[in-house]
């Protein structure tokens, strides 16, 4: 019996993904100067405000605000007309050192305990060179292409976007065909919806998906809800850990 499996990926400008990247960048900065850093950093974004909170014990001297602004700038939130911009967002720092009680429980000369932070889902497989299941590999590929086209060609695309790819598998658990592709992207106010759909189909989707898995029944759902002008942290709250 065949079945359909769907995976989702979001763009670098999606609110949750912005938060992931800020927390990740802060971790990288801490580890670069102090490999023994202990970092539990959460990020929250809404409207034009970025909040970092958590517990960090490190000898590294990290300017959290500068790190956050660089991440946002590199993503492409630069102009204030989006309602969220790297130079103007309000920044709140609620980071403290790790609790001494937790520190005592995980420190030691020989045996180390572990904190309670973990993230587990999924599996490795041989479906793709990335050793990831095909639906998530293709969904990620679409979002990487979206970022490339947006940054090099513009075309009215904005940073916030999401993709879903549904694959039909045969009874031997092998990918049989692509059942459907959903790609929704934020766009400029002056971009016509049909023009947007043509841009996404020709500039992004067509270059990412294997032709052998496409057929006349494959469904392309591009901005199926219609216009998507208000996006990013103005449209949704973002939080670390929901889109890693």
Model-identified regions with their sequence ranges:
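N-terminal, positively charged regions that mediate nucleic acid binding
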Residues: 1-40
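Flexible hinge/switch segments at interdomain interfaces of large molecular machines
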Residues: 1-5, 45, 177
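Glycine-rich, mobile lid/loop segments that gate access to catalytic sites or pores
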Residues: 6, 66, 73-234
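Short glycine-centered, acidic/aromatic-flanked micro-motifs in structured strand/loop junctions
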Residues: 12, 54, 185
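Short, charge-patterned binding micro-sites
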Residues: 40-58
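Short glycine/threonine-rich loop-to-helix capping motif typified by GTGT followed
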Residues: 55-62, 226-243
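Active-site-surrounding "flap" and adjacent substrate/cofactor-binding loops of secreted or lumenal enzymes
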Residues: 58-72
């Amino acid at each position: 019996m065949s079945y359909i499996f769907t995976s989702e990926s979001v763009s670098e400008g999606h609110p949750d993904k912005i938060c992931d990247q800020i927390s990740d960048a802060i971790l990288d900065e801490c580890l670069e100067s102090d490999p023994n850093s202990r970092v539990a950093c959460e990020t929250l974004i809404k409207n034009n405000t970025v909040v970092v909170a958590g517990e960090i014990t490190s000898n590294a001297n990290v300017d959290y605000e500068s790190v956050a602004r660089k991440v946002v700038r590199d993503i492409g939130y630069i102009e204030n007309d989006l309602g969220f911009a790297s130079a103007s967002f309000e920044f709140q720092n609620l980071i403290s050192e790790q609790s001494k009680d937790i520190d005592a429980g995980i420190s030691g000369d020989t045996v180390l305990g572990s904190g309670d932070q973990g993230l587990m889902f999924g599996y490795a497989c041989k479906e793709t060179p990335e050793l990831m299941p095909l639906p998530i590999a293709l969904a990620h590929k679409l979002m990487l292409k979206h970022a490339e086209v947006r940054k090099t060609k513009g075309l009215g695309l904005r940073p916030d976007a999401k993709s879903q790819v549904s694959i039909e598998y045969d009874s031997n658990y092998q990918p049989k065909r692509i059942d459907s592709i959903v790609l929704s992207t934020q766009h400029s106010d002056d971009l016509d919806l049909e023009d947007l759909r043509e841009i996404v189909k020709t500039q992004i989707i067509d270059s990412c998906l294997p032709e052998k898995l496409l057929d006349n029944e494959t469904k392309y759902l591009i901005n199926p809800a219609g216009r998507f002008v208000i996006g990013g942290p103005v449209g949704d709250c973002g939080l670390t850990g929901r889109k890693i």
